[in-house]
A protein has these predicted regions:
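N-terminal targeting/anchoring "stem" of glycan-biosynthesis enzymes
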Residues: 2-449
């Protein structure tokens, strides 16, 4: 009797355990099935919470989403985008974000190959896809913003001209309300909304830095520009290796274990040296209006502060990104501290690369050279410098670096117009939490590492 009872009990327990095992297996399968679905749902946010901080995802995850939110049959047209490369990038991004607010595809805008305020009679339009990769942009910004071509138009419902307001009475709130109203009703029924008036750089700003950064990350220069920039960087590093190899050769006489000179690293510093005539006039007026004396920097101040960034033990090439045509001072190559070897385009013998391109392309090449430099030093009131620092900040952020204070980091940037530690320039990272692009568009002395 006892044996029979024990046998029944064993079978009962065995059945229960088997049932429990199947339930556990089913639960595991359910979790594995639902996991990618849940991850997909939450990845659309672009940012997840981790230890109460915003964790900015990698480039591929940040921009991965579907394209359902951007209408392909409704378009926004904007005025020709003008001024320098930096202003045109901001104007383009603002046009993209305006199109996003209206849930429309932005018709590919015309850029300007020449400086508007310097060459009014010689303004040269240049197609967007002569500067940036069109298909690459739509691929990287898929689901966020979208570019379209005029060939996509069906011309069924005509064009609605939207006049942008101006003057003091045209406030940020009024501008935003106009855009909201244009996203619905009879205005939205038109195939194309054409904004008339000021160029997009001068429009009111309604978006945080992070949204601009998403657009900037999608802007990839065409291969021709990237190759030209690679040629300049290769020349800089080649000269750096030659100069360092001489130092290594001298040292090798004293130390037989010295590493082969052919393997010597050749880091370089890029300095966006704003000492041109037009800049000095502009910054002096800006200092007078604002009461801030940390905008202009003399070449002596720049040389001294840059010289306090690195040691003078090994020779380091300093590439001077300067608008040669606007420069009225050939002495920028003299007076640098020991160990710093300055080169501008002519001394580097790459001026021929720049001369065969219009102003916008020349600026794009310099932008890439500054972005690829091991150390970048610029002016915090220069939009060009600010956009270079933003790109370098994004590189560091993707590496998990959130600040550069007191530590050695990859892609460090500095502002020479603001004093930092040890009489050097102030370390500089873009504040990705800013609610607008004001500091980048117009400059600021409130920067930090």
């Amino acid at each position: 009797m006892d044996l029979s009872s024990n046998s029944k009990l064993s079978r009962l327990i065995g059945c229960h355990l088997i049932s429990l095992a199947w339930k556990c297996l089913a639960l595991v399968i359910m979790v594995l099935f639902l996991r990618p679905v849940l991850l997909h749902l939450f990845s659309g946010c672009g940012v997840i919470e981790w230890n109460n901080q915003d964790l900015i995802l990698s480039h591929s995850l940040l921009l991965s989403s579907n394209d359902e939110g951007v209408r392909r049959e409704k378009f926004l047209e904007v005025p020709q985008i003008v001024w320098g490369l930096n202003n045109q990038k901001i104007a383009f991004a603002r046009a993209c974000l305006t199109a996003r607010m209206l849930n429309r595809t932005l018709l590919i805008p015309s850029l300007s190959a020449s400086l508007f305020y310097k060459e009014i009679d010689q303004l040269q339009p240049i197609s967007f896809d002569k500067v940036f990769q069109f298909d690459k942009f739509n691929s990287l910004c898929n689901g966020f913003v979208r570019l379209g071509r005029y060939l996509d138009l069906k011309n069924q419902t005509g064009i609605y001209d939207l006049q942008k307001g101006s003057g003091r009475k045209w406030t940020v709130e009024r501008d935003k309300e106009q855009l909201k109203q244009s996203s619905r009703g009879h205005v939205d029924e038109h195939e194309v909304i054409r904004i008339v008036g000021k160029n997009p750089f001068l429009w009111h700003d309604h978006w945080p830095v992070k949204e601009y950064a998403r657009v900037f990350e999608c802007l990839v220069f065409v291969d021709e520009i990237l190759k030209e920039a690679d040629k300049v960087v290769s020349k800089i590093r080649h000269i750096g290796r030659k100069l360092r190899s001489k130092t290594v050769t001298v040292q090798s006489d004293l130390n037989a274990d010295t590493e082969d000179s052919s393997k010597a690293a050749a880091p370089f510093i890029a300095v966006h040296m704003r000492v041109e005539i037009d800049w000095m006039i502009h910054c002096k007026k800006l200092e007078q209006r604002s009461g801030i004396n940390q905008i202009c920097s003399s070449k002596q101040e720049i040389m001294q502060r840059v010289g306090n960034i690195v040691s003078s033990e090994s020779p380091t090439v300093v590439y001077l990104a300067v608008a040669d045509s606007l420069l009225n001072d050939s002495s920028i190559l003299r007076g640098w501290m020991k160990g710093l070897l300055p080169f501008e385009k002519k001394k580097l013998r790459v001026d021929g690369i720049y001369k065969r391109h219009p102003y916008l392309i020349r600026s794009a090449i310099d932008y890439m050279v500054c972005s690829m430099a091991d150390i970048f030093v610029g002016n915090s009131y220069s939009t060009f410098s600010s956009l270079v620092v933003l790109e370098r900040t994004l590189k560091m952020t993707r590496m998990g670096i959130r600040n550069s204070c007191g530590i050695d980091v990859r892609w460090p940037s500095y502002a020479y117009n603001i004093p930092g530690e040890s009489n050097g320039p102030q370390k500089w990272m873009t504040n990705m939490s800013d609610s607008s692009l004001q500091a980048i568009s117009y400059g600021s002395n409130a920067i930090s590492c």
